[in-house]
Amino acid sequence: MKEIKGDYMINKLGWKIGGEQGEGLESTAEIFSTVVNTLGYHMYSTRDFASRIKGGHSNSKICISEEKINVIDYKTDILIAFDQATLDSYIPELDENSIIIADAKIKPEISEEIKGLVAIFPITDLAKEIAHPIIKNIITLGICSALLDIDSKLFYDMIESKFSSKGEEIVNTNIQAFDKGREIMSEFMAENNINDKYYLKKLNPTHKNMWLIGNHAAGLGALVAGCRLYAGYPITPATEIMEYLFDKLPMVNGAYIQTEDEIAALGVAIGANFAGVRAMTATSGPGISLMTEFLGMAAMAEQPVVIVDVQRGGPSSGLPTKTEQSDIFHAVYGGTGDASRIVLAPISVEDCFYTMIDAFNMAEKYQTPVIVLMDLQLGMNKETVPSFDFNRVQIDRGNLLKQEEITEEDIIYFKRYTTDVLVSNRTIPGQKGGIHNANSYEHSVVGLPSEVKRNTVRQKEKRANKIESALVERPFVLNEYNDEKDILLVGVNSTYGVLNKAAKQLKEQGMKIDTMQIRQIYPVAQAVRDTFDKYRKIYIVEHNHNKQLRTVIASKYHNSEKIASLLKYDGDIYYTHQLVEQLLEEEK
């Protein structure tokens, strides 16, 4: 047996569990991370799983740190293997201080390339002796509790909370399994002189962090923004938004509708907004493709609506459980005619909450569809976030008139689409003096179909110009690490952390790199272009093959030849070393 070298008291830790999908690995990771959150640590997670219910390899990785973390470290300190693929696939992530815990049931073949200490336990056999093979996950938690010196009571409380509804016997059986895991690891640690090398001390945080996925943060943001109707159809990786709002909307007298398809979902949401109710839908690539015609209708009829697109690998059914950022073209340009709309993009789980409030406000302020683009990594994976600041929340319903504000009550039709201003006044059904037509045809100022050339030009220019004038409060986040401006790394969604970590690493090598994370993809903010002017070279980092974000931004920038791309489109997240290697190659 190898002895762990040196004092390895943890201030950050990479924990990974792998095995066959459908065997409860995700539940193990969830219980483990929830307990670690009570210790006061920051965490950031990722999952790799197949588009099936059971079978095939999957894994979950959680990065733990005393400081704020928003990037997955490539290095793995603790690797738990319930299949041979876990032992074979992640060798490059291990070093001499790593510990590998394997289930004897898989008859593990340990490669000579594996660094670190290997512990093989009869986890499944012990689970069978206690109750059932599935309880191996609780034994695993006991193993981790001993290795990291986490108080057993924290896990007991979690087990009690999770299984109390199934009776005292089930609770006691799970506690027995946990204790067995703790016992066998304690014996192993004593035999191998591990002592306190991996202990996670309890911190004393000034506040407790939430442990959330982006989809849930977005759902809560929608509720706080005043969303009172959700219409949708289930699709990976956006379904958690639908499930969250299904549970929460009744608490605020809201309504939830699971429609027959995505087309109907957007139609219902548009109709609710027309009636004055803030409403939304959420989907992914295949779903937003079906919604395209209704997107055009909402743009033509100048109806507010919010659509969340949690991007996955495409095209078509593509890679439902892999991350990608390849719906940017569709979000910005998708549809017939000149159907401009606003496209926002949160940069973190915390920002998913605030971006949804921005989206609902902008949808009504500019009377247009607003698409909130997320990616699978941001939507489905967890991050520790501070409690949301509800004092920051402001509701802006734009030019939606109250009854007393409608001055010409005796007219037959209300001039809903006047071209005298970019954003005209808006009324809802039932208001006296507010009658107008809203449909998919080009129209006059009162909404009646019109093919008059002069009117057509004015209406098209009004719709386009109001979108071009749209600006969210923070269109991007700029991190400046150098006084001298040389290279700017630009990203969107979940790449925020990896861009900043790469910039800091390369600064140590003498490179002068700042980062910009885009929050408003379209329209391209003038401030983005002004910032670009300060740098010698701009690299846009994105998860797609067609350089979609670069194309959108470059089309609005006068010096586009200095914009280059760094791309990754294999379905996996960016790791810092990969981005660093790409950038160094480009800068040769």
PLM features: residue spans?
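Gly-rich Lys/Arg/Thr-decorated short loops/hinges at beta-loop-alpha junctions or inter-strand turns
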Residues: E160-F163, E187-H207, A222-C227, F246-V252, ...
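Thiamine diphosphate
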Residues: M9-I91, T236-A331, I342-A363, E508
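Flexible, glycine/charged-enriched surface loops at secondary-structure junctions
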Residues: T46, L154-F155, G167-Q176, F188-L200, ...
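Flexible, low-complexity linker and terminal segments
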Residues: N204, W211-A218, L223, T355, ...
